[in-house]
Curated annotation (Swiss-Prot):
Biased composition range(s): Low complexity: 703-726, 863-882
InterPro entries: GLI-like, Znf-C2H2_ZIC1-5/GLI1-3-like, Znf_C2H2_sf, Znf_C2H2_type
Post-translational modifications reported in the UniProt record: Phosphorylated on multiple sites by protein kinase A (PKA) and phosphorylation by PKA primes further phosphorylation by CK1 and GSK3. Phosphorylated by DYRK2 (in vitro). Phosphorylation is essential for its proteolytic processing. Transcriptional repressor GLI3R, a C-terminally truncated form, is generated from the full-length GLI3 protein (GLI3FL/GLI3-190) through proteolytic processing. This process requires PKA-primed phosphorylation of GLI3, ubiquitination of GLI3 and the presence of BTRC. GLI3FL is complexed with SUFU in the cytoplasm and is maintained in a neutral state. Without the Hh signal, the SUFU-GLI3 complex is recruited to cilia, leading to the efficient processing of GLI3FL into GLI3R.
Protein name per the record: Transcriptional activator GLI3
Residues modified as N-acetylmethionine: M1
Keyword Metal-binding tagged: yes
Gene: GLI3
Region (Mediates interaction with DZIP1): 745-845
GO function terms (MF aspect): DNA-binding transcription factor activity; DNA-binding transcription factor activity, RNA polymerase II-specific; RNA polymerase II cis-regulatory region sequence-specific DNA binding; zinc ion binding
Length: 1580
């Protein structure tokens, strides 16, 4: 070896001398030396053997001497004597040690690195300089060139043993001034054998701790004062550093000699200790868990002057790069060189041992650069965490290929796994790779492609707007003629053409960014931004404005990212490290890494040629592109068509890290062309396929294998990350508004904080089996990994589930669409969506990020809130008010400050998008989802809901997914809905919520409570006067109403006629027709459970069940007693049939024991469980709050039961009606004011709420159990009631309609319609709907849809404030959502669009409660929905004063059929009596996790009505904080924070007993907290 090394040394010496001497001046020499290492100066001295990039220096260094012979390895100029001396000392360990006299590389000249002169012209600095002056910088530095001494450190010739020793490669060697005695190189200048114990170490320490010390200068030898020792020139200093192992320098003891290296017996413990304890410098630690590898590209370096570097590029990288992470390990570097310990110019030509030294140098440069960036890089050696048995560094070839040895900048060096490639640009290769899993790894994970362009031009050119434009640079084109459509101008130069196009065509058509170039493959598909078009045009003109600024390099690129990739060839940066365990190879671009990984570590060929008939598959995207280009023609490459417009391809199969190996077999086929898969492209979103990228495109998180793979905060790779694409891919229509989300090049769509799992899922917009499979596959894989991390999703989507129909720009829904957010609409049919889908969609809902809720891929960031493991996003509030979120937010979540599922500002859910997000899902639903998910994935079962033991069997079964009514889950998606339609549930139109009313803007829960505005409120009517005095405008016939409702004609802006329930936008004619027919045909069965917050459902169920069953039978008059005929009850102008129904309940005597009095703790409320026992609810005195809510919500429309029962713990509540008639009195049932009804007949008796009216008296009116029952029971056949106008003013609603499930006539709806063609349009049937079926869940025969068992007249108070709190909810129907669930049933009365009416009520409402005269459609949902019982849930959801569209909650069936059995009605909620009855919201002290009563159906059928969501705006912004504002509003007049529903309706004051709402109740909070903890545990 020695002989060889000597010979090589001689040869190299000659070569080096030649190369250096070629320069005319010393300065040139120094410059050239520098340039040779830093910039390739092939142009000036093509003959030089080493043109290399900073890191390529390593690549240039062959492993063996023979290889070196070709490389100019500067022999040490030191005399052989010296070398021999050293050899003796080190026992021959360093055969080629250069003489100390020429400290640097043994070039013939010992040049001073500072001035290029042969002799150091600066006096050596003091032995221990107080500080190192800054590195002198001259213009050349600004020019991007460093001028290092060409005669730097002599090559560190180490024995092969040393080279193979893992210690070297693993140790980041740090140069420290040896302070050696110049006279005796062999002797340690310090007497102590272990200098680290000595002042010297103190000095070192000072270096570490002293930022003032310019480590950059120290590392580079740039600073004249850096010479560490008086007798030592900087060159010597570095030389000695290099020789530390051989000399008795302070580190001689630490650094293993050849012998020790050979044995590998080096004790690094000391170093470790030193490293970790003494030198807390910022250098990279061995810890593999750092952030992802950051490109150390100078471009990414904040200290790098891009503008100077890219002098010629019109589009300087500065703006981009300055903003890029400056934390790259090279952050301290001046230019493309990181402030590495040894200047690249000092490139060592190493002999056989060089590999280790290379590693050493690179490590130094990497780590030190890291430290030096801070101005104080630890000079100490950084021990490798472990030293494997001696073995060559894995990534480094033992011998360099000639190509590699040859000119450095050659890009081949990049592509080849050169020795240097082993070293990642940042950090130890070993650690680097492990610690920084770049999502952009080889596979084109979204961020990756952008960076990893192939230097050649094959680099992926990610077209911001379209992946079509593969990243590869276009063929050399020099177009001078304009081929723009209609333009044939010719120019002399390309520049002129470009100018013409930009000014005349692009800027001239500012409104539309379309390429009209003839034969453009984009086919005039518009770009989302002008800059995209500008970049795109370069494909046609051949313009390549981005030129490489390194001297001698003539490369130019049309895309900046390609230039950046290319620059890596000069800088040697290789940010893409092989993710295979034990492989340290690093690559400058992801494609090369992909190639390496797929070829070396697997046989996978994920990149499949998409050209029809071609079956070629490749290991990397660049090969695929090359194939496509050469075989199929330049135009064939990666076009969207290839990618398959049919449905977005799943992200390239390649997933980072270990996943890369684990890719599912199916993935490869799915892998798109590298380019296509270019998911890695930051902007790689195709126009059509919106990829919501969750991570910074530029540099995906290290930890996350793929951008979507892991949240930045998670060190684990997200299970979903396998799909690098990680993001939603939603097909957008051409101009899809959402496409913009990720359209911007280099603009990460989502924060790295995105949930780990979140990103990976991509919904396949197009319904495509492949997509579905992909989704299934992804989910399965992810689920396996993620069990417990987030709510369990069904791993396998229903066949169509993943399909998201193309997003429609305007947001209209085609087919069955769920509007996802903004303009996008998901079109999956009801059958398509499964709980999983819903969950996913909900999660999509999560974040408001860029343009729509869609932005978060599929789960909200887990970071979002400590307690909301999966849902809320950090920016929870943004979304929260964003879209018309009337929907199903689980009240509990919304207002439970500690809700388990949501953070207090439960991300959007709080105000809730219409999507039934998990937040929206009731606890039961969530529970069920989890259970299903666990079952599917084999994970542990979810934590049982707190009240499970109390739940009815049915509820339990439902939770377990054995729902009795599997079909009754979500409204059929196919039920047509227009944006104009309100009502998430069943897609019925939603009631206007106060905030929906004109003039009501979005309002945060924190905003002061606003009472319903006049506009929303029904026209004021004297409270105590009879209804007839109100003289509301006559209602249109039911048919008319229906049509009007559909058309929203019923909702004139002004006055009384405003139909609050109608959706804000008038439906189109076609919509009317279609909706009408579809709604009538809709067969989805909805349970209240589906929409009402779990808590509410539970509460309602419990109420209904107990009260209903207990009292209903007893209190309900026999059918004979109760008028079944439509004529039985007339509720003149009864705004809400609902009221009537509920009134019954009010009237029903409530058992003394009922909890009606119980204050609804806010927690309870939040849980959705006012813990009234079902019986209590059923009991007459229904908690006013809920009832009131139900009733009172109607803005000012208070339906006061004429005779609210005072019986029961009425004391606490005000009886809704002053006169309480037994439930049985049909007359009371009759809402009509007829004097006979026991209250002043027509007068709207505002049953004086005993409690102060909160606008709406929240007075908890005792609700007659029967009434409640009725309400629930009346799952109203409201469907039939549907648009039946209640008899208008004076018209008496006949609630008595028997609710025979199938009785159309009997159905309240029909009856209502029939009876009161003109009726107020108040859906008496709403009342009915709620109460109609009160006859008992089990008693279909008794179901009286419209039948309000209670005879009490419900006085509908039109005064906006008069909404009886209980009137609605309290109303006679125990099971009425209004009463039970919908605390807001009244809401339906109220103008608020979202009425919390029971779904049944909804039916009623939709029947048309016009505020005044107009039919107020609850949610505008046609109650017609096929006899699906609408769970009251949706209505109830509106606890807070928010009215939900959900009022529409009627099961469409219910409403339509109106025939659903009472049991259905009763159960409407979630099988109200059965499922949820036991799910009472936990008692005051019990908090039901919102997840608690997740109804399996609810999830399953959950259709997310995106339109509604969008439409509604922030209807239901439940208080993000705690209780649903509505509920609380009146609970605590003063506590607006809790009660500030956006649409805060006045609530009747609660009686003290109820007002005891434990809004601040600690026990409730604690309970809630405990539940949350449980929930989180489950989630995790």
């Amino acid at each position: 070896m020695e002989a060889q090394s000597h010979s090589s040394t001689t040869t190299e010496k000659k070569k080096v001398e030649n190369s250096i001497v070629k320069c005319s001046t010393r300065t040139d020499v120094s410059e050239k030396a520098v340039a040779s290492s830093t910039t390739s100066n092939e142009d000036e001295s093509p003959g030089q053997t080493y043109h290399r990039e900073r890191r390529n220096a390593i690549t240039m260094q062959p492993q063996n001497v023979q290889g070196l012979s070709k490389v100019s390895e500067e022999p040490s100029t030191s005399s052989d004597e010296r070398a021999s001396l050293i050899k003796k000392e080190i026992h021959g360990s360093l055969p080629h040690v250069a003489e100390p006299s020429v400290p640097y590389r043994g070039t013939v000249f010992a040049m001073d690195p500072r001035n290029g002169y042969m002799e150091p012209h600066y006096h050596p600095p003091h032995l221990f300089p107080a500080f190192h002056p800054p590195v002198p910088i001259d213009a050349r530095h600004h020019e991007g060139r460093y001028h290092y001494d060409p005669s730097p450190i002599p090559p560190l010739h180490m024995t092969s043993a040393l080279s193979s020793s893992p210690t070297y490669p693993d140790l980041p060697f740090i140069r420290i001034s040896p302070h050696r005695n110049p006279a005796a190189a062999s002797e340690s200048p310090f007497s102590p054998p272990h200098p680290y114990i000595n002042p010297y170490m103190d000095y070192i320490r000072s270096l570490h701790s002293s930022p003032s010390l310019s480590m950059i200068s120290a590392t580079r030898g740039l600073s004249p004062t850096d010479a560490p020792h008086a007798g030592v020139s900087p060159a010597e200093y570095y030389h000695q550093m290099a020789l530390l192992t051989g000399q008795r320098s302070p580190y001689a003891d630490i650094i293993p000699s050849a012998a020790t290296a050979g044995t590998g017996a080096i004790h690094m413990e000391y170093l470790h200790a030193m490293d970790s304890t003494r030198f807390p410098s910022p250098r990279l630690s061995a810890r593999p868990s750092r952030k992802r590898t950051l490109s150390i590209s100078p471009l990414s370096d904040h200290s790098f002057d891009l503008q100077t570097m890219i002098r010629t590029s019109p589009n300087s990288l500065v703006t981009i790069l300055n903003n890029s992470r400056s934390s790259s390990s090279a952050s301290g570097s001046y230019g493309h060189l990181s402030a590495s310990a040894i200047s690249p110019a000092l490139s060592f030509t190493y002999s056989s041992a060089p590999v280790s030294l290379h590693m050493h140098q690179q490590i130094l440069s990497r780590q030190q650069s890291l430290g030096s960036a801070f101005g104080h890089s630890p000079p100490l050696i950084h021990p490798a965490p472990t030293f494997p048995t001696q073995r060559p560094i894995p990534g480094i070839p033992t011998v360099l290929n000639p190509v590699q040895v040859s000119s450095g900048p050659s890009e081949s060096s990049q592509n080849k796994p050169t020795s240097e490639s082993a070293v990642s640009s940042t950090g130890d290769p070993m650690h680097n790779k492990r610690s920084k899993i770049k999502p952009d790894e080889d596979l084109p994970s979204p961020g990756a492609r952008g960076q990893q362009e192939q230097p050649e031009g094959t680099t992926l050119v990610k077209e911001e707007g379209d992946k079509d434009e593969s990243k590869q640079e276009p063929e050399v084109i020099y177009e001078t003629n304009c081929h723009w459509e209609g333009c044939a101008r010719e120019f002399d130069t390309q520049e002129q053409l470009v100018h013409h196009i930009n000014n005349d065509h692009i800027h001239g058509e500012k409104k539309e960014f379309v390429c009209r170039w003839l034969d453009c493959s984009r086919e005039q598909k518009p770009f989302k931004a002008q800059y995209m078009l500008v970049v795109h045009m370069r494909r046609h003109t051949g313009e390549k404005p981005h030129k490489c600024t390194f001297e001698g390099c003539t490369k130019a690129y049309s895309r900046l990212e390609n230039l950046k990739t290319h620059l890596r060839s000069h800088t040697g940066e290789k940010p893409y490290v092989c993710e295979h365990e034990g492989c340290n190879k690093a690559f400058s671009n992801a494609s090369d890494r992909a190639k390496h990984q797929n070829r070396t570590h697997s046989n996978e060929k994920p990149y499949v040629c998409k050209i029809p008939g071609c079956t070629k598959r490749y290991t990397d995207p660049s090969s695929l592109r090359k194939h496509v280009k050469t075989v199929h023609g330049p135009e064939a490459h990666v076009t969207k068509k290839q990618r398959g417009d049919i449905h977005p391809r799943p992200p390239p199969p390649r997933d980072s890290g270990s996943h890369s190996q684990s890719r599912s077999p199916g993935r490869p086929t799915q892998g798109a062309l590298g380019e296509q898969q270019d998911l890695s492209n930051t902007t790689s979103k195709r126009e059509e396929c919106l990829q919501v990228k969750t991570v910074k495109a530029e540099k995906p998180m290290t930890s996350q294998p793929s951008p979507g793979g892991q949240s930045s905060c998670s060190s684990q790779q997200s299970p979903i990350s396998n799909y690098s694409n990680s993001g939603l891919e939603l097909p957008l229509t051409d101009g899809g508004s959402i496409g913009d989300l990720s359209a911007i090049d280099e603009t990460p769509i989502m924060d790295s904080t995105i949930s780990t799992a979140t990103t990976a899922l991509a919904l396949q917009a197009r319904r495509n089996p492949a997509g579905t499979k992909w989704m299934e596959h992804v989910k399965l894989e992810r689920l396996k990994q993620v069990n417990g991390m987030f709510p369990r999703l069904n791993p396998i989507l229903p066949p169509k589930a993943p399909a998201v129909s193309p997003l429609i720009g305007n947001g209209t829904q085609s087919n069955n669409t769920c509007s996802l957010g903004g303009p996008m609409t998901l079109l999956p049919g009801r059958s398509d969506l499964s709980g999983v889908d819903v969950t996913m969609l909900n999660m999509l809902n999560r974040r408001d990020s860029s343009a729509s809720t869609i932005s978060s891929a599929y789960l909200s960031s887990r970071r979002s809130s400590g307690i909301s493991p999966c849902f809320s996003s950090r920016r929870s509030s943004e979304a929260s008010q964003a879209e018309g979120r009337p929907q199903n937010v689980s009240v509990a979540d919304s207002y439970d400050p500690i809700s388990t599922d949501a953070s207090r500002r439960s991300s959007e859910a709080s105000q809730s998008d219409g999507l039934p997000s998990l937040l929206s899902l009731t606890p039961a639903q969530q529970y069920r989802l989890k259970a299903k998910y666990a079952a599917a994935t084999g994970g542990p079962p979810p934590t049982p809901l707190p009240n499970m033991e109390r739940m009815s069997l049915k509820t339990r079964l439902a939770l377990l997914g054995d729902a009795l009514e599997p079909g009754v889950a979500l409204p059929p998606v196919h039920a047509p809905r227009r944006c104009s339609d309100g009502g998430a549930h069943g897609y019925g139109r939603r009631h206007l919520q106060p905030h929906d009313a004109p003039g009501h803007g979005v309002r945060r829960a924190s905003d002061p409570v606003r009472t319903g505005s006049e506009g929303l409120a029904l026209p004021r009517v004297p409270r105590f006067s009879s209804l007839s005095s109100c003289n509301p405008p006559a209602m249109a016939t039911s048919a008319e109403k229906r049509s009007l409702v559909l058309q929203n004609y019923t909702r004139p802006e002004g006055g009384q006629s405003r139909n609050f329930h109608s959706s804000p936008c008038p439906p189109s004619i076609t919509e009317n027709v279609t909706l009408e027919s579809l709604t009538m045909d809709a067969d989805a069965n909805l349970n209240d459970e589906d929409f009402l917050p779990d808590d509410v459902v539970q509460y309602l169920n419990s109420q209904n069940q107990a009260g209903y069953e207990q009292h209903f039978p007893s209190t309900l008059p026999d059918d004979s007693k109760v008028p079944h005929g439509p004529g039985d009850f007339d509720a003149p102008g009864l705004p809400d049939s609902h009221a009537g129904q509920q009134f019954h309940a009010l009237e029903q005597p409530c058992p003394e024991g009922s909890k009606t009095d119980l204050p609804i703790q806010w927690n309870e409320v939040s849980s959705g469980s006012a813990d009234l026992s079902s019986s209590k609810l059923k009991c007459g005195p229904r908690p006013a709050v809920p009832q009131t809510r139900a009733f009172g919500f109607c803005n000012g429309m208070v339906v006061h039961p004429q005779n609210p029962l005072r019986s029961g713990p009425a004391g606490g509540y005000q009886t809704l009606g002053e006169n309480s008639n037994p439930y049985g009195g049909p007359e009371h049932l009759m809402l009509h004011n007829s004097p006979g009804s026991g209250t002043s007949g027509n007068a709207f008796h505002e049953q004086p709420c005993k409690a102060p009216q909160y606008g709406n008296c929240l007075n908890r009116q005792p609700v007659a159990p029967g009434a409640l029952d009725g309400a629930c029971g009346a799952g109203i056949q409201a469907s039939k009631l549907k648009s039946t106008p209640m008899q208008g003013s004076g018209g008496q609603l006949n609630f008595g309609l028997p609710v025979a499930p199938n009785e159309s006539a009997g159905s309240m709806v029909n009856g209502m319609q029939n009876q009161d063609p003109v009726g107020q349009g108040y859906l008496a049937h709403q009342l009915l709907g709620d109460s109609m079926q009160h006859p008992g869940a089990g008693r279909p025969g008794q179901q009286m849809l419209g039948q309000i068992s209670a005879t009490s007249h419900i006085n509908i108070y039109q005064g906006p404030e008069s909404c009886l709190p209980g009137a609605h909810g309290m109303g006679s129907q125990p099971s009425s959502l209004a009463v039970v669930r919908g605390y807001q049933p009244c809401a339906s009365f109220g103008g608020s669009r979202r009425q919390a009416m029971p779904r049944d009520s909804l039916a009623l409402q939709s029947g048309q409660l016009s505020d005044t005269s107009q039919t107020c459609r609850v949610n505008g949902i046609k109650m017609e929905m096929k006899g699906q019982p609408h769970p009251l849930c949706s209505n109830l959801q509106n606890y807070s004063g928010q009215f939900y569209d959900q009022t529409v909650g009627f099961s469409q069936q219910d409403t339509k059929a109106g025939s659903f059995s009472i049991s259905d009605a009763s159960c409407l909620l979630q099988g109200t009596s059965a499922k949820n009855s036991e799910l009472l919201s936990p008692g005051a002290n019990q908090v039901t996790s919102t997840v608690d009563s997740l109804d399996s159906h609810d999830l399953e059928g959950v259709q997310i009505d995106f339109d509604a969501i969008i439409d509604d705006g922030d209807h239901s912004s439940l208080m993000s904080g705690a209780l649903s504002p509505s509920i609380i509003q009146n609970l605590s007049y003063s506590s607006s924070r809790l009660t500030t529903p956006r649409a805060s309706l006045p609530f009747p004051a609660l009686s003290m007993s109820t007002t005891n709402m434990a809004i601040g109740d600690m026990s409730s909070l604690l309970t809630s907290l405990a539940e949350e903890s449980k929930f989180l545990a489950v989630m995790q």
